[in-house]
């Protein structure tokens, strides 16, 4: 794990994160649908995209490989986001609670983070709903860059708590 971390440090030093913009979507449900809606909107507006999530790795809506995880390893995320430097406008990804908790978003820059919803799930891994919610919150407190935009569902369980954490970082905020 330390070697893995050192490799990522070296990669980031030699080649900073490449996409012009990066969007990460988290939530109990709706991550895949939301990322695909975004990718389709981008396609029809001639925005070059890369997408990773439950359905695999995609460049401009064409599948390039399968993925066994919703959020691949941080090395896989980093390499895919930085591949093909030309036409690298937007990187869209699904941010799972496991991936966030395990630091798979370390070394990635996220410009826009969104949470679709939050309900009891993955308690076999997280043990408590609070721990599960805290892992989702990492997208906004640790991963989203300081000039980033947070998009929050106003009907979210723990909405006020999420809102207070986001406001404490002075992030731009959009609610729906």
Please place each PLM-identified region on the residue numbering.
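Switch II (G3) loop of P-loop NTPases
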Residues: 89-98
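Short, basic phosphate-binding NTP loop
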Residues: 1-26, 33-46, 170, 175
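Short beta-strand-centered segment that lines the nucleotide-binding/catalytic pocket of NTP-utilizing
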Residues: 46-59
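Residue-level signal for inorganic ion chemistry
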Residues: 10, 25, 52, 77, ...
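Flexible beta-alpha connector loops of hexameric P-loop NTPases
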Residues: 64-72, 121-126
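Conserved helix/coil segment N-terminal to the catalytic DExD/H
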Residues: 98-106
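Acidic, Mg2+-coordinating active-site environments of NTP-dependent enzymes
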Residues: 19, 86-87, 101, 110-176
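Conserved alpha-helical scaffold flanking the Walker A/P-loop in AAA+ ATPase domains
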Residues: 76-83
């Amino acid at each position: 794990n330390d070697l893995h971390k050192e490799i990522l440090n070296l990669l980031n030093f030699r080649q900073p994160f490449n996409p012009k913009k990066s969007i990460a979507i988290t939530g109990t449900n709706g991550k895949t649908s939301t990322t695909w809606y975004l990718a389709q909107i981008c396609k029809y507006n001639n925005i070059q995209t890369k997408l990773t999530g439950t359905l695999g790795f995609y460049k401009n809506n064409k599948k390039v490989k399968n993925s066994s995880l919703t959020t691949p390893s941080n090395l896989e995320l980093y390499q895919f986001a930085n591949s093909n430097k030309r036409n690298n406008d937007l990187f869209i990804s699904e941010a799972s609670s496991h991936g966030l908790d395990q630091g798979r978003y370390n070394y990635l820059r996220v410009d826009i983070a969104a949470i679709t919803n939050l309900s009891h799930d993955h308690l076999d891994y997280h043990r408590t709903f609070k721990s599960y919610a805290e892992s989702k919150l990492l997208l906004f407190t640790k991963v989203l860059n300081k000039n980033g935009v947070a998009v929050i569902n106003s009907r979210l369980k723990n909405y006020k708590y999420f809102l207070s954490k986001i406001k404490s970082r002075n992030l731009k905020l959009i609610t729906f």
